[in-house]
């Protein structure tokens, strides 16, 4: 299998991290859609240029789940079930348990590339988002034993395009 370059991204969660990812990707010419249960956060993120209101009109190449860790497993699994060809990554701070929970939900973990940017600010929400938030920051990728290597490389390329330094580690 040879994956085409990632050109379209759906970000689920438009807080500080999700909106910052969207802003950075859009400055690099990517098509970005946003989804968020919080309509106010979504509106602010769209106004700040983080992306277009989703869902996308076609399957995205990449889904980035940027929601609180407590709901991340179910949102990741739902994304893997909904977008059958997309690679799915996340930004949650916990990894080993999250990966077990995603797998227990019957999701295709070969397409799941867990990640966590070591970046943030003293303020939260999409109003505080910055396109340069990830510049020179470590972004850990923690692929599981069944994660597809090409998908991991594709996510690493996107992360590096944000100016982040990719570190691959175990969950």
Where are the language model's segments positioned?
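NAD(P)+-binding Rossmann beta1-loop-alpha1 motif at the extreme N-terminus of oxidoreductases
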Residues: 1-54, 62
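Phosphate-coordination loops involved in phosphoryl transfer and adenosine-cofactor binding
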Residues: 5-8, 60, 85, 136
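Residues at the starts of beta-strands that form the adenosine-phosphate
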Residues: 8, 31, 111, 138, ...
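Structural motif
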Residues: 10, 64-66, 140
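Short beta->alpha hinge that forms the Motif I/post-I loop of the SAM-binding pocket
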Residues: 37, 67, 91-93
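N-terminal Rossmann-like NAD(P) cofactor-binding module of classical short-chain dehydrogenase/reductase
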Residues: 63-64, 89
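Rossmann-like NAD(P)(H) cofactor-binding subdomain of soluble oxidoreductases
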Residues: 75-128
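Internal alpha-helical scaffold of NAD(P)-dependent oxidoreductase catalytic cores
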Residues: 133-171
């Amino acid at each position: 299998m040879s994956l085409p370059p990632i050109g379209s991204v759906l970000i689920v969660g438009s807080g500080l991290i999700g909106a910052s990812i969207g802003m950075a990707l859009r400055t690099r010419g990517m098509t970005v859609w946003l989804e968020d249960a919080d309509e106010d956060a979504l509106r602010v993120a769209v106004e700040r240029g983080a992306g277009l209101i989703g869902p996308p009109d076609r399957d995205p190449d990449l889904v980035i789940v940027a929601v609180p860790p407590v709901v991340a497993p179910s949102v990741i699994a739902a994304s893997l079930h909904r977008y059958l060809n997309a690679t799915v990554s996340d930004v949650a701070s916990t990894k080993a348990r999250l990966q077990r929970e995603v797998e227990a939900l019957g999701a295709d973990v070969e397409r799941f590339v867990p990640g966590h940017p070591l970046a943030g600010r003293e303020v939260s929400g999409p109003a505080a988002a910055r396109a340069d938030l990830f510049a020179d920051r470590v972004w850990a990728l923690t692929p599981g034993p069944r994660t597809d290597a090409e998908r991991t490389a594709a996510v690493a390329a996107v992360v590096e395009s944000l100016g982040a330094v990719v570190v691959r580690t175990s969950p």
